[in-house]
């Protein structure tokens, strides 16, 4: 496919998916995105019934390159992997856990970039464990038309690597079908809110690649 994104420019996207890899029930995906200011390769595998239990487990491998010269005066490369697992607590409540190890490189820093960015030029290794609790009262997870969902999560970086911080984050969406308001079933009104808090530790400073941003890279 193709399209246009305000943060990446014109883009092309190619993906392959096998929902039952070699008859194992594993969902395998690979995706390649090429854009004016971004290129990305993702490979992921997911077992929806890991160890024949009510447990979803999977792994992702990724490589991302971003050209931020026009907005921030630097380029960024990320390469790493994520191991993840999730389970249902009850009909509406679920929890997920993940571990991520990623090498980040901030390079080609413009001489006119801020001192804050220039001081962060180079590579860092992020080792992070995360958890998210989701309370979901939507009528559908795939194509919701009514209801709401709320998420609360935390990230701990510093289990190895050279980046140290604690982050708390939360977000939610509320869906109102236009059929209820105007009698038109083809549209849905969505209200969304999100926020986060970050605290570095072990003498570390917050880095621009770890901060919260609004827009295309929202969290």
Where are these regions (language model features)?
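C-terminal outer-membrane beta-barrel translocator/porin domains of Gram-negative envelope proteins
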Residues: 1-10, 103-219
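Gram-negative/organellar outer-membrane beta-barrel architecture
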Residues: 1-151
């Amino acid at each position: 496919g193709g399209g246009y994104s305000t943060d990446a420019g014109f883009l092309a996207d190619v993906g392959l998916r096998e929902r039952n890899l070699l008859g194992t029930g594993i969902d395998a995906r690979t995706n390649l995105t090429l854009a004016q200011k971004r290129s990305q390769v993702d490979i992921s595998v997911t077992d929806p019934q890991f160890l024949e239990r009510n447990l979803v487990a999977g792994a992702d491998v990724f490589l991302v390159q971003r050209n931020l010269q026009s907005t921030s005066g630097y380029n960024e490369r990320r390469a790493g992997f994520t191991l993840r697992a999730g389970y249902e607590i009850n009909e509406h409540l679920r929890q997920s856990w993940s571990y991520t190890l990623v090498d980040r490189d901030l390079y080609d820093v413009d001489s006119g970039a801020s001192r804050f960015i220039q001081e962060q030029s180079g590579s860092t290794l992020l080792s992070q464990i995360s958890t998210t609790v989701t309370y979901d009262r939507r009528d559908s997870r795939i194509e919701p038309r009514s209801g709401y969902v709320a998420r609360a999560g935390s990230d701990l970086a510093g289990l190895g690597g050279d980046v140290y911080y604690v982050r708390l984050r939360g977000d939610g969406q509320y869906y109102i079908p236009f059929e209820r308001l105007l009698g038109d079933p083809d549209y849905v009104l969505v209200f969304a809110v999100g926020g986060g808090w970050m605290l570095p530790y072990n003498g570390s400073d917050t880095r621009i690649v770890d901060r919260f941003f609004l827009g295309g890279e929202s969290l």
